[in-house]
Amino acid sequence: MARKKKEEAQQTRQQLIEAAIGQFATRGVASTTLTDIADAAKVTRGAIYWHFTSKSEIFNAIWEQQLPLRDIIHDRLSLSDSDDPLLKLREQFITALQHIAHEPRQCALLQILYHKCEFSSDMISEREIRKRIGFNDDTLRSALETCISRNIISPQVNVDLTLIVFHGFFSGIIKNWLMNNDSFNLYQQAPALVDSILATLPVIRVSPDEGAYCSAPGNISPRAQSASMVCALTGLPNR
């Protein structure tokens, strides 16, 4: 009996968190009341206070349980550590954008982060949330350094500056799409968007591994992908 009550309590807590995500994304954090959350979760306001002391505590609980995007998409990736690191990075970026476009919960979370929240001192900071849910800078840095060591991109690339550029590009794309998701199809255009971003890197070698990507519909060979990036950078035609 005690175990059942504990499970029911945990279920109610999660109901409140999911309801809060929906309400925050729609109304904004500041405009959402505890009553709004209780009504959306179909529980009493008293049930909220059994689990949370304030709206800020619910907000913090949302992000504390959120997995990093890199972990969420891990099982969807086809390339391994032995494959071309630039193409692996490309696949991760594309899959991440497509996940955001396809999953309403992920979309709602980012809507809250980018457009529906004014942070206060009792809330997890925007910086901490970004660090918690995004791609790890050390992982991206390692991927770029591997590309340099394997002569895929120029050794003159400033890795730290490139990370700043990547963050700016992806934040801008996601923010603009969230403001008006009818303005472009993020899911369909994710490959072209990522290729345009990676085209800022001076690629100096075309990967010889034509088998890096599987033959599923929509996949492009590594040679064609790398050639596309080089052509986008130089302005030369892609023949």
Label the predicted regions.
Residues 1-27, 31-43, 56-57:
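Basic, helix-initiating cap at the start of DNA-binding domains
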Residues 1-11, 207-239:
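N-terminal intrinsically disordered/low-complexity leader segments
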